[in-house]
């Protein structure tokens, strides 16, 4: 039984300048990033690399159409390295760009063509949530299928994962919270996954501690205090990525995908809507497994009784990021059934990682409670 894989070499630099100079970014490199990152942080240190801004191809979550249009614009140009500097959307797209190109990226996500890596991939995350710099997963909205779908393959691992706290310090508050909540959920779902083991647990627990303790300090000292402890979130997110990259995530992510895909809710925010409700259901189904350890861990960090762990967690997170019923994002009541079918049909890759199996009825009931 394989216990742990950490495929990329992990680097950390204080500044973008240090990163650009160390990796000698220049001719033969393709940088995928955002203009608001490129202009202040990267442009003056770029020695001839082609730079493309992801937002030119559309806003929000990555999609198969976005990927197709970028590949079309690349045309016959040949690159040695793909360098992703950005959040989850940039990273997910860059992973696909590191592969041998196909006419339609939908074929990759639907398994119709093989994944063949033919370029080095350097990932520099600029949010503190995806952990995607150390995972072999890429997720995109499939426009023609009206859902989000992920593919997992070792061909998608980065060659180098590079942590640069300078990027995170300027992250707008809303993006900081939604991305770091996503990291917390990665760590927690990975901890209760049937694929978890002592190695992944070590990364999960430390990630949960770093992120939750950081949140508690922010509530006490103000939201701007996050800049003082930003490395805790950067490292915590990376640890969470290592955990879920090996153990997987489950129902929280699976049920959130139709919401994110159809109503363009940011990924971390969509996950947060389902987080505590699904873990309460897990506990009702089987209170004696690892969910008991999660409750104990949360209670210790949040200084509450184990029976109040999820309520206390919700109270803490609600102070940082407000939640709304699903209907306020645009979801229609009749979509409860269709979304449940969509999850069962398209998200088995995630559902197999559930702490306890979720029936169609469980999925429908979860949507109803949150509607």
Swiss-Prot record:
Note the superkingdom of the native organism. Bacteria
- The EC category is oxidoreductase
Q: Which UniProt keywords apply?
A: Copper, Iron, Metal-binding, NAD, Nucleotide-binding, Oxidoreductase
Tell me the cofactors it needs: Fe(2+); Cu(2+)
In this chain, Fe cation is annotated as bound at 182, 186, 253, 267
Enzyme Commission number, as recorded: 1.1.1.61
What CDD domains does this protein map onto? 4HBD_NAD (cd14860)
Co-factor: note: Binds 1 Fe(2+) ion per subunit.
Any single GO molecular-function term of the entry would be: metal ion binding
Expression is induced as follows: Induced by growth on ethanol plus succinate.
Q: Where does NAD(+) bind?
A: 88-92, 126-130, 148, 267
pH dependence of activity: Optimum pH is 6.1 for the reduction of succinic semialdehyde and pH 9.4 for the oxidation of 4-hydroxybutanoate.
- What's known about how it's activated or inhibited? Inactivated by oxygen.
Concerning InterPro entries, the annotation shows:
ADH_Fe/GldA, ADH_Fe_C, ADH_Fe_CS, Alcohol_dehydrogenase_Fe
Function summary:
Involved in the anaerobic succinate degradation pathway. Catalyzes the interconversion of gamma-hydroxybutyrate (GHB) and succinic semialdehyde (SSA).
The record's section on PANTHER family has:
ALCOHOL DEHYDROGENASE (PTHR11496), HYDROXYACID-OXOACID TRANSHYDROGENASE, MITOCHONDRIAL (PTHR11496:SF83)
Subunit structure of this chain's protein: Homodimer.
Family to which this protein belongs: Belongs to the iron-containing alcohol dehydrogenase family.
Q: What is this protein called?
A: 4-hydroxybutyrate dehydrogenase
Which organism is the protein's source?
Clostridium kluyveri (strain ATCC 8527 / DSM 555 / NBRC 12016 / NCIMB 10680 / K1)
Upper classification of the source organism reads: Bacteria, Bacillati, Bacillota, Clostridia, Eubacteriales
The gene for this chain is 4hbD
């Amino acid at each position: 039984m394989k216990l742990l894989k950490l495929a990329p070499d992990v680097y950390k630099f204080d500044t973008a300048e240090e990163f650009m100079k160390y990796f000698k970014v220049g001719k033969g490199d393709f940088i995928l990033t955002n203009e608001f990152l490129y202009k202040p942080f990267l442009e003056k240190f770029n020695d001839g690399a082609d730079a493309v801004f992801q937002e030119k191809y559309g806003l929000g979550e990555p999609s198969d159409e976005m990927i197709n249009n970028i590949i079309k614009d690349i045309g016959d140009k040949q690159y040695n390295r793909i360098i992703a500097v950005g959040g989850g959307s940039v990273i997910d797209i860059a992973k696909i760009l590191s592969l041998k190109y196909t006419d339609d990226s939908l074929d990759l996500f639907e398994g119709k063509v093989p994944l063949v890596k033919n370029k080095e991939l350097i990932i520099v995350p600029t949010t503190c949530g995806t952990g995607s710099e150390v995972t072999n997963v890429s997720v995109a909205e499939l426009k023609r299928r009206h859902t989000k779908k992920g593919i997992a393959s070792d061909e998608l691992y980065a060659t180098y994962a590079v942590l640069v706290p300078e990027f995170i310090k300027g992250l707008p508050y809303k993006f900081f919270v939604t991305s770091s909540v996503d990291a917390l959920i990665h760590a927690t779902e990975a901890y209760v996954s049937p694929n978890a083991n002592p190695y992944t647990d070590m990364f999960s627990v430390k990630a949960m501690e770093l992120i939750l303790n950081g949140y508690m300090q922010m509530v006490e000292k103000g939201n701007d205090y996050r800049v003082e402890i930003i490395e805790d979130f950067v490292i915590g997110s990376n640890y969470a990525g290592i955990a879920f990259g090996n153990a997987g995530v489950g129902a929280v992510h699976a049920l959130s995908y139709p919401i994110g895909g159809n109503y363009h809710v940011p990924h971390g925010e969509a996950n947060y809507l389902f987080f505590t409700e699904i873990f309460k259901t897990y506990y009702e189904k089987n209170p004696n497994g690892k969910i008991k350890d999660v409750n104990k861990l949360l209670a210790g960090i949040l200084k509450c009784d184990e029976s109040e762990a999820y309520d206390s967690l919700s109270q803490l997170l609600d102070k940082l990021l407000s939640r709304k019923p699903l209907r306020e994002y645009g979801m229609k009541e009749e979509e409860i059934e269709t979304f449940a079918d969509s999850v069962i049909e398209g998200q088995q890759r995630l559902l197999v990682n559930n702490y306890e199996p979720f029936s169609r009825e469980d999925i429908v009931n979860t949507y109803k409670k949150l509607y």
